[in-house]
Structures are given as C-alpha cells and as structure tokens.
C-alpha cells in the first residue's frame, strides 16, 4: 500500500494495486452531479380530484382530528412511525472539527442515506445555526413531535453529554448520540469476540482508552457496564486521574470510576501490562515498543481516521493478536453502520421511549453473535457492513427489551 499525503488528512490516498481512486476528488464530482443525496418521494397517487381530496383537504381533516384526540395516533396516521431526525450544530464533523451547519450537511445527508439503505429507516437531516446548548435543546424539543426518534450527530464534547441527557429527560421518544453510543456498541461487540480469540477474560483484563471525548467516554462507560473492572483513560496529557488538570465536568466524573489505582504518567506508561487498547484519538501515537510492553496477545482497536494510532502490521509485528481500525481496507473494521440502523429500526418498530443501557449491551452481543464461532479468528471479529442480517438481528435484540 502506498500512502500519499497532500497535507490535508482527508485528502490522503490509500492506493492498492487493484484499486486506484482519489475518493476526495471523485466524491466532490459526484456530489456536484447528485445535488443532494436524499429527496422526498410521495407514497400516494394524486392523479385526480378524488386523490387530491383524500391526500389533502377536505379529507385530511379527519386524521388530524383523530390525532388531536390521541397523539399516539400520529404513529398510525403519519410517517412518524418510521422517521427519525438527524441533527447537528456542525461543531465536530468527522475529523474536520467545527466547520459549521452548512458544511456539515453532506455528512448529515450521508447519514440519512445509511439509515435508509441499511435499516429501512427514513431520516431527515437538520443543521442548526447555533452552538448554544439551551437553543439546541429547545430547537429539538420543538420539532420532536414530527419524529419517532432523535439521532444527535457531530456535536462537540462536553456539550453533547448535557444535550443528550436533557433531551432524554424532556422527550418520550428515543434520543441517541451515535458518535458516543454507536461507536461504543461496535467496539464492545468487537472486544467480546476478541476475548474469545485470545482466551482472555474481562475480569482479568486491563483496558486503556485513549481519547476522552464523546466516543472515549461512551466506550469506557459501556465497557464498565459490561463488566471490565480495570479501565484507565488517557488524553493528550497522558493518564487521567483525580489529580489531572484541565478536565471538563464529564472527564472529572469519569475519574470516579476509572484508574482506581490512581496511576499517573504517559500513554506509554498506561500501556505497560495492558491487555486491551482502544484509541479514539490521533494518528501514529502508539509505537511498536508500546505494544510490545502490553500483555501477551494484546487486543488493539486503533480507530483514529484516516490514519490509526498504529498501523495494523506494525502492531502485529510487536505482538498484538487482534487489531481493529476504523478503515475498510484493513480487517476488523469498527463501523457504526452495523449498529445505529438496526437500533433505530428496533426502537421505532417497538415504539420505544428510550434506548437503555441494556439495549446497548444487547445490540453489542447481537452484533458479536453474527460471526459464527467456526469463522471467528484474529482477522474476523465483526460482521461486514453489507451483511444483510445485521439490521434485523440488532433490531430484534432491541425489540426484545421493549
């Protein structure tokens, strides 16, 4: 593989012998041709006066009156039963950062495409021109009656934590921040299978999570819920402890349940004797020496994109047994698309009012279970994004808990 760096990490080209494509250039060209990736398609004929009178006035008044008497009828008489909102403020879009609502729209449209193509769920992207927490909460609450679920997307930490928590308290429909929980669910699914491959037990594993933003916090919380007792979080300054400086309120909360040994030092110090590394941080920050200092048959999920914390071949050379990344050109891709479409499909079909921790665990177990025991190996711990079983399997796991 040849890596060509133009200076912009999102313009890097990963060229294999059998496939040479400049994804940035080709995607820009296609977006110009598409002029938007989604559109409204009507489900009813309007070919004569009777059709018009049934779809609109005067006939439409009757379903309006029925919904007025019982708002739950909105799920039966409108598209609300299978419609979610994808909402962002453009403050943390991919690895591009704070690029604003207009520039975030291609990603939000793409997310809507994934909802539909992988889960059969209709999604409407909304990009808000505010980064004020209260304004975002108010905006979502005011528009929520039109939707069956809310997917928060690309909102920077720590505001995303408060926004999600408050919306869950205020609304009686599922609210889900995919950057947090979708990532955490797929990571846990991969780790569940990686433990089988390595023969390690969760009770004995020391876990290091590098990156203390939205994804890192959510991954840590879900791993704790699953039963990993020994987790250390790190950020750009090294190991996070109760004595760390410049932590936000959520990171301070996490010091109460992680790094119980009160260790200090660098990421390299944290990795000594660790069994599992989960990186949602920055490229090339883990060396072969650091991997070699981990326990035998280490598990690494290096998910910085487009360049991971360490390249899989280097990690394997240093002794790692299982390596996952966020990229499709390496084995064990950690891809949220195996989680969120099925989660929303199940939540909407089951008319859930929230997505619980038990549902997240069930989704992770369902995803892990899609890889048969006889096919499980260090290069095959997660199902492919295009596996047609994924959404229905995850959906069933969610509905079974409603």
Predicted regions and their residues:
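N-terminal ligand-binding/catalytic initiation module
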Residues: 14-173, 395, 401
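General beta-strand structural signal in soluble alpha/beta enzymes
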Residues: 125, 151-154, 175-178, 209, ...
């Amino acid at each position: 593989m040849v890596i060509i760096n133009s200076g912009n990490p999102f313009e890097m080209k990963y060229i294999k012998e059998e496939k040479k494509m400049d994804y940035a250039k080709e995607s820009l060209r296609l977006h110009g041709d598409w002029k938007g990736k989604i559109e409204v398609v009507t489900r009813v004929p309007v070919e004569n006066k009777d059709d018009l009178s049934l779809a609109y006035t005067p006939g439409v008044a009757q379903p309006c009156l029925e919904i007025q008497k019982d708002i739950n009828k909105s799920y039966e008489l409108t598209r609300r039963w299978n419609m979610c909102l994808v909402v962002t403020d453009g403050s943390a879009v991919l690895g591009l950062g704070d690029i604003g609502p207009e520039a975030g729209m291609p990603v939000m449209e793409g997310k809507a495409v994934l909802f539909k193509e992988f889960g059969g769920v209709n999604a409407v992207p909304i990009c808000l021109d505010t980064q004020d927490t209260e304004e975002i909460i108010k905006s979502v609450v005011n528009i929520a009656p039109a939707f069956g679920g809310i997917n928060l997307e690309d909102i920077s930490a720590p505001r995303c934590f408060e926004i999600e928590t408050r919306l869950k308290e205020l609304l009686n429909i599922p609210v889900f921040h995919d950057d947090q929980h979708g990532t955490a669910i797929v990571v846990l699914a991969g780790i569940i299978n990686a433990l089988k491959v390595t023969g390690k037990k969760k009770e004995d594993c020391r876990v290091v999570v590098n990156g203390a933003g939205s994804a890192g916090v959510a991954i840590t919380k879900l791993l704790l819920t699953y039963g990993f007792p020994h987790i250390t979080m790190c950020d750009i300054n090294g190991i996070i402890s109760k004595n760390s400086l410049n932590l936000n309120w959520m990171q301070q909360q996490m010091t109460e349940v992680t790094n119980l040994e009160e260790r200090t030092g660098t990421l390299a110090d944290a990795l000594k004797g660790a069994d599992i590394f989960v990186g949602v941080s920055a490229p090339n920050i883990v060396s072969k020496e650091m991997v070699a200092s981990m326990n035998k048959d280490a598990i690494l999920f290096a998910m910085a994109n487009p360049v991971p914390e360490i390249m899989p071949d280097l990690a394997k050379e240093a002794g790692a047994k299982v390596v996952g990344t966020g990229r499709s050109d390496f084995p064990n891709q950690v891809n949220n698309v195996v989680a969120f479409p099925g989660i929303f499909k199940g939540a909407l079909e089951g008319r859930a009012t929230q997505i619980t921790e038990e549902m997240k665990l069930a989704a992770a177990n369902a995803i892990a279970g899609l890889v048969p025991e006889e096919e499980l190996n260090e290069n095959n711990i997660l199902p492919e994004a295009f596996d047609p079983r994924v959404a229905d399997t995850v959906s069933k796991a969610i509905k079974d808990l409603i």
